[in-house]
Amino acid sequence: MANQNQTILAIYNSLCDQQDALSAAIQTTTDPQLAVTISTEIDEIAHRIVLTQNLLFKQDSPQLTASVNDIKTASQSLTTAIAQIQNTIAFVNSVTSYLTYVDQAIDLAKTLAV
């Protein structure tokens, strides 16, 4: 039986944690526009969750492993932005930054899978 790629698993877990945090945030907002914004970002993260699920058993590499540090840093910034979610621009920028690092790691993992 093959083992799961621990780097991809770490990215997957980070995405799930952020999706959970956004799901909690949307349940407490009273601003309809903010709810739409949060929902859009939840969709973006959910898409990456599906992509990482499809890569869980793919090959690892030093470059992929190194990418997790950038993702962790961006994830911490996103967690802070979620706590201050009323600042919509900072929140969206933080999600964008986080997903940029995630996308780079996913793209690298896909090239290793070929």
Whereabouts are the PLM-identified features?
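Short, cationic, amphipathic peptide segments
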Residues: 74-114
